[in-house]
Amino acid sequence: EALAHIEWEKPMVDTLRHRLVSKWNESEDEAFKHVIRFDVQKTEELFHGNWSDESKEEYELSNHTDVIYYGLDGIIKNRKVDLIIGGPPCQAYSLAGRAQDPYSMKRDYRNYLFESFVKIVEHYQPELFVFENVPGLLSACPGDTPVRYRIYDAFKSIGYDILSPNELKNAVYCSVNFGTPQIRNRVIIFGVRKGSEFKLKDFYEALNNRKSDKVFTVKDALGSMPKFRPLDKPIKVGRGNVSHELIGDVHIPLHIARYHSPRDVKVFEEWISKNMNHATTEERLNYYTKITGIKSNHIKYRALEWDKPSPTVVSHLYKDG
């Protein structure tokens, strides 16, 4: 039984509430109460309610009145919390984010948002917690002390065992090994309360035992989807342009083709015909500059390969589905 969910961004909150209603048969009122839109840095208000005027101005319309006045404690009441799952935003730790920031994200406050997660664990004292983030967390060092040491010390100070800072490199898992057709690496940190009957090593053994040698590919994921064909001429629909139409009568929600501009089509054709996926990094960066006139330190173009998992779908591609 999930007692509560906390998210900061409204689209994620809306998605969770919708799933509780449509999938788990909660009433809309219960879903509105159990999914909280709030800033976890304001832990006292999160726990106890009685929100400040500033918090009400920002979050009141997005939350149930019980949450505003009684906080998370009022939602959970006296029920025992067995498990907390979460983690801070990944932007400060991601290698891509650090490469783009003039200070390598060393001055970014999000380096320290794990402290709010620690406070939540300390407040509710679960038997276990699961903390996940990008592998860049293991090398992030916004001050004199690497983040992984800060995290270890923080959880140790509130009575929880996690892997040591040097052992955490063995806690990086790839989604491909768990039946997902996309390469996405994450650090998974299990925490066990000292004195608990649970053993830390048992959770990592269980996770490792779920690994599979079977690799799911782009073809496995998308091969049976209805196909599209290009229109003779793009058309205007609402405020956007449409360049493709679905073949056949099978319609799957959100299965739509992004508009392909003439430049897009040229890039696709050249990239595939010249096998640019296997060109050198310099060649691919130069090609991007030739097309856009913009210099980049990151490879922006890549064709998905039918017989392999997809590379990580980065967050700016959310608009493409």
Model regions and ranges:
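Core alpha/beta nucleotide-donor-binding catalytic domains of modification enzymes
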Residues: 1-124, 135-148
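Conserved beta-strand scaffold positions in the cores of enzyme catalytic domains, especially
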Residues: 3-5, 35-37, 162, 170, ...
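Short His-Asn-centered micro-motif
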Residues: 6-7, 132, 315-316
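Substrate-binding/catalytic groove segments of enzymes
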Residues: 23, 197-198, 321
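Class I S-adenosyl-L-methionine
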Residues: 74-78, 93-292
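Residue-level detector of short, conserved catalytic/binding motifs and their immediate flanks
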Residues: 82, 118, 187, 299, ...
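Short, well-ordered beta-strand micro-motif
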Residues: 85, 188-192, 314
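Class I SAM-dependent DNA methyltransferase catalytic core
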Residues: 215, 288-321
